[in-house]
């Protein structure tokens, strides 16, 4: 039920996708600024990540006893009161049924009321923290570091901002039939079917947070990944297997680069090919021969070997051409190699 309310809050507030809803009321106090959380991908087919709280802060995994001097600023964000009637049919309804924990038999909708009141935002002074961590090192003997380092799927993150309530808040849910009066009155002892539910939680409860990933180097230095492009994790030692995979990756990259070069050189050829045969009903071969000045010849008959076409550049094995023109000269040669159709005609059309 608490998870359903925090998910709805994050969805409505937005913040560019950086905000993460607090999944459980019992763990809300563990998502404070400078706290550490573990980020894991749920599975290969599920794009979203799962954040797990830890009992540690950034200071706990650093060498030395010096406190982190980066301050935390806070300000009022908004006044949040939400009442919504959600259908049980559909994607959002399926998610809410799993979160609210009430009996929905015979119901087609759920009325949800969340009263958070004024919420405040507490965030770490990023510039101050970035200056400070340049002289700090990670303690690799810390249990959290050892366990995270052994897992390739886990990424350590530091909480950079949290959103909290300022007063006692209430959440209430009622399952019913759309069209009925969806009133919020809750008497648990007189509600044996469990179709209504309400909770009250104290002030200063964290309902959402955002994180920066940590990238940790082999020497203990670390970086804060302040943009979504940067990815956290641990720098890996270069082993024999790692070196082999690195070389294999470079070989595949070089091969793909060569393929892309061939494609880029042949793009002009392909564009004109489709243009000629799909946009123009008349063959350009007939047009070029009407000029009478440039004639397509077989270069093999003149002791000139086959080779790549001067226009499209495609000249490997079966794509090499034996045709060309003696009236054109390129690169000091008194002939050019051109594919019979359509390169020969495209070349001469562009020379006009």
Curated annotation (Swiss-Prot):
Membrane spanning stretches = none
* Gene Ontology annotations for the cellular component aspect, listed alphabetically: ciliary rootlet; cortical actin cytoskeleton; cytoplasm; neuronal cell body; peroxisomal membrane; stereocilium base
Q: Which GO terms describe its biological process?
A: detection of mechanical stimulus involved in sensory perception of sound; pexophagy; programmed cell death in response to reactive oxygen species; regulation of peroxisome organization; response to reactive oxygen species; sensory perception of sound; stereocilium maintenance
Cellular location of this protein? Peroxisome membrane; Cell projection, Cilium
Q: Which UniProt keywords apply?
A: Cell projection, Deafness, Disease variant, Hearing, Membrane, Non-syndromic deafness, Peroxisome
Q: Does the keyword Membrane apply?
A: yes
Tell me, what does this protein do in biology? Peroxisome-associated protein required to protect auditory hair cells against noise-induced damage. Acts by regulating noise-induced peroxisome proliferation in auditory hair cells and neurons, and promoting autophagic degradation of damaged peroxisomes (pexophagy). Noise overexposure increases reactive oxygen species (ROS) levels, causing oxidative damage to auditory hair cells and resulting in hearing loss. PJVK acts as a ROS sensor that recruits the autophagy machinery to trigger pexophagy of peroxisomes damaged by oxidative stress.
Membership in a protein family: Belongs to the gasdermin family.
Q: How does it assemble?
A: Interacts with MAP1LC3B; interaction is direct. Interacts with IQGAP1. Interacts with ROCK2. Interacts with TRIOBP.
Disease link: Deafness, autosomal recessive, 59: A form of sensorineural hearing impairment with absent or severely abnormal auditory brainstem response but normal otoacoustic emissions (auditory neuropathy or auditory dys-synchrony). Auditory neuropathies result from a lesion in the area including the inner hair cells, connections between the inner hair cells and the cochlear branch of the auditory nerve, the auditory nerve itself and auditory pathways of the brainstem.
Other remarks on this protein: 'Pejvakin' means 'echo' in Persian.
UniProt-recorded name of the protein: Pejvakin
């Amino acid at each position: 039920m608490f998870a359903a309310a925090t998910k709805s809050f994050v969805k409505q507030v937005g913040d560019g996708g950086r905000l993460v809803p607090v999944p459980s009321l019992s763990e809300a106090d563990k998502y404070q600024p400078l706290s550490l959380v573990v980020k894991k991908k749920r599975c290969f087919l599920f794009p979203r990540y799962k954040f797990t709280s830890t009992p540690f802060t950034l200071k706990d995994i650093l060498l030395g006893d010096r406190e982190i001097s980066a301050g935390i600023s806070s300000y009022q964000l908004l006044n949040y009161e939400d009442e919504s009637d959600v259908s049980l049919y559909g994607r959002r309804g399926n998610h809410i049924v799993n979160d609210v924990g009430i009996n929905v038999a015979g119901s087609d909708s759920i009325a949800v009321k969340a009263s958070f009141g004024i919420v405040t935002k507490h965030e770490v002074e990023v510039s101050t923290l970035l200056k400070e961590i340049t002289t700090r090192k990670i303690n690799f003997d810390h249990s959290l570091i050892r366990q995270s380092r052994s897992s390739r799927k886990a990424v350590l993150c530091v909480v950079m901002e949290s959103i909290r309530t300022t007063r006692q808040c209430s959440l209430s849910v009622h399952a019913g039939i759309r069209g009925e009066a969806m009133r919020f009155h809750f008497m648990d002892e007189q509600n044996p079917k469990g179709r209504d539910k309400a909770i009250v939680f104290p002030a200063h409860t964290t309902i959402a947070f955002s994180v920066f990933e940590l990238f940790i180097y082999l020497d203990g230095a670390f970086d804060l990944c302040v943009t979504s492009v940067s990815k956290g994790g641990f720098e890996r030692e270069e082993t024999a297997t790692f070196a082999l995979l690195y070389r294999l990756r470079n070989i595949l990259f070089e091969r793909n680069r060569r393929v892309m070069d061939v494609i880029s050189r042949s793009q002009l050829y392909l564009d004109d090919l489709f243009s000629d045969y799909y946009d123009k009903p008349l063959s350009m071969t007939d047009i070029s021969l009407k000029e009478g000045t440039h004639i397509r010849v077989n270069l093999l008959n003149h002791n000139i070997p086959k080779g790549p076409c001067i226009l499209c550049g495609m000249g490997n094995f079966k794509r090499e051409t034996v045709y060309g023109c003696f009236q054109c000269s390129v690169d000091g040669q008194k002939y050019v190699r051109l594919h019979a159709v359509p390169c020969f005609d495209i070349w001469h059309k562009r020379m006009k």
